[in-house]
Amino acid sequence: MALSDEIRQECGITWEDEYTDAKIQAITARATGILNNMMGGTCDFETDMQCRQLLCALCRYIYNNAAEEFTKNFAMELTACRLQHQATEYAKGAEQDEQQTV
């Protein structure tokens, strides 16, 4: 399922119109920026299902005007995702360093 369709489903949107489409695009862009900032880097929302689920949830919170509640309600998931993201980035950096020294 396409990410935009998944977000629409998460928000309970079953109709299509230009206003709603534009609103979902703006919310998705905002949520992507927020999560990338929280993770300390760029998340791959196509392959990282943990980050993808957080993105869908954050979009739902923003859509329902409850963005300020997201961090509190998803603190454990955000911490786990950030740790995983940082570990992956560290491993990539270590691998690149190893290749440069060979």
PLM segments and residue spans:
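Mid-chain, well-packed structural core segment of small domains
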Residues: 42-49, 54-67
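C-terminal structural segments of small proteins and small subunits
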Residues: 63-84
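Alpha-helical structural motif
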Residues: 3, 27, 55, 70, ...
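Conserved short "hinge" loops at termini or chain/domain junctions
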Residues: 1-51, 84-102
